[in-house]
Curated annotation (Swiss-Prot), chain A:
Its EC number is 6.3.5.-. The lineage of its organism: Bacteria, Pseudomonadati, Thermodesulfobacteriota, Desulfuromonadia, Geobacterales. Keywords: ATP-binding, Ligase, Nucleotide-binding, Protein biosynthesis. Disulfide bonds: none annotated. GO terms for biological process: glutaminyl-tRNAGln biosynthesis via transamidation; regulation of translational fidelity; translation. This is Aspartyl/glutamyl-tRNA(Asn/Gln) amidotransferase subunit C. The keyword Protein transport does not apply. The keyword Nucleotide-binding applies.
From Swiss-Prot, chain B:
It comes from Citrifermentans bemidjiense (strain ATCC BAA-1014 / DSM 16622 / JCM 12645 / Bem) (Geobacter bemidjiensis). This is Glutamyl-tRNA(Gln) amidotransferase subunit A. The keyword RNA-binding does not apply. Keywords: ATP-binding, Ligase, Nucleotide-binding, Protein biosynthesis. Belongs to the amidase family. GatA subfamily. Allows the formation of correctly charged Gln-tRNA(Gln) through the transamidation of misacylated Glu-tRNA(Gln) in organisms which lack glutaminyl-tRNA synthetase. The reaction takes place in the presence of glutamine and ATP through an activated gamma-phospho-Glu-tRNA(Gln). The gene is gatA. It is an enzyme of class 6 (ligase).
Amino acid sequence: MKITREQVEHVARLARLELSEAELDTFTGQMDSILSYVEKLNALDTEGIVPTSHAVPMENAFRADEATGSIGVEAALANAPLRAQSFFRVPKVIE
Amino acid sequence: MEIFDLTIHELHEKLKAKEVSSVEATRAMLDRIEAVDSQVNAYITVTPEQALVQAEDADRRIAAGEIAPLTGIPVGLKDIFVTKGIRTTCGSRILENFVPPYDGTAVAKLKEQGAVIVGKLNQDEFAMGSSNESSYFGPCKNPWDLSCTPGGSSGGSAAAIAARTATATLGTDTGGSIRQPASHCGCVGLKPTYGRVSRYGVIAYASSLDQVGPLTRDVTDSALLLGAVAGYDPMDSTSVNTPVPDYVASLAKGVKGIKIGLPKQYFIEGLDPDVKRAMDEAIAMYKSLGADIREVSLPNTEYAVATYYIIATAEASANLARYDGVRFGHRAEDARGLAQMYSKSRAEGFGPEVKRRIMLGTYALSSGYYDAYYVKAQKVRTLIQQDFLNAFKEVDVLLTPIAPTPAFKIAEKLEDPLQMYLSDIFTIPVNLAGTCGISVPAGFSAAGLPIGLQLVGKPFGEQEILTAAYSFERETQWHLKKAPL
């Protein structure tokens, strides 16, 4: 086994996903078979190979430090599930 | 020939000659959607009111003599493109009621030309899938055979071309999501080089792989639509600042003397016999047109799918962290405390394929596994990219199948995600290498399903693959056959 049910539960907590018992079982089996398949990469010797994070070689992209327009408070809040005045409202963070 | 059957360039000529107005063309398209889309489910949202206002505006421009190639043309957009004031779902419950406050760059460019947006197209949820079955808004069907999938993730964008419910569409391609559905639906689909088209306003899946591209009825339209959306954009720091050529002007150059490579790892046992036959006929056609055909090697091909499913899921797990129920999107009603609000909102908002990929990506990035999976995959990506650069020292263009089989049946691969992932084996390497590829209709299976041919170009070699595709299309005319709908 590449991955256990306990590890899958741990990953779900890291990913902030509440999974049902049935989902945990399904994902354990599926992730195990996918990770077993991915093992084939270990057949390749990649010692000294530079990792590619980006397809096109590029430097940092900077722009001039000048203020530009923004969409405004009302537009920014228009999709909020819950708002209070000009804020996003969320449940209490510290009990 | 009905108005909804026309290509962009044919409709453009009629608009210019005032044989038809944009309002008439748009009404014809909206009527066609009304008549057939209940069978296909290519559209998540149809926007008749906005479309008719845009069409009236286009007609005013045309009357004033200000006609651009896309002025007055009814187009559809994959629902991954954010559109100001028009609901944008990305095929997900979590964005079911999301109405973006701005237009992305590709959309803004289409609007500047006066294109008419008739609606937002079905797709796999967050572009994760190869069959359009992971959409929260139900599967899209293949117009050539309604029991088959149209491919994915841009399934609606391809199906709308085949069903003739849009003159042209935009999709996105992260591992084949434009080319594979184009192949399965018998249309032309182009994935440009990474950085060629701005990703600003395109909902992110895997940022180092995602790219915007056109799905069209023919190669000329592909060149036109690519030219309309390509170019540097200060809002996307990964867009590349190289000039956009006139892609249409070079189409008729022909293929005499160009070197076409056949990667031997792509012509293997297990290729569907109908696909194999279509490839053999295409190779013979290119030979007869004077192309120089040779075998090349892409030795790391067999590692591409494994590499992709680490890199794409890792990037996805980071990108999709933004769906937390705070600023936009679905929020669970009955959560206790902030942490549970996150995890419940995400659990309710995401479907199984998205959860699976977030889980895989989170695992690959988690402490203790980062080097073994993520860094390893990035190193193999270097080798795969190197394979392509080496091949392009010998040849101008690569010719390959798009998919090992024609369109598969709905539900056929749902229970086995790995089998679904493996169906993208011929398209994924192009995204990892960051270069460009096009799918062109190349025949039909015995069962009457379309088969696509892939031409892969050098980075920023869109002109070469469009020219090669155009030569093939002109000789074969597969693109003229219509789905029985």
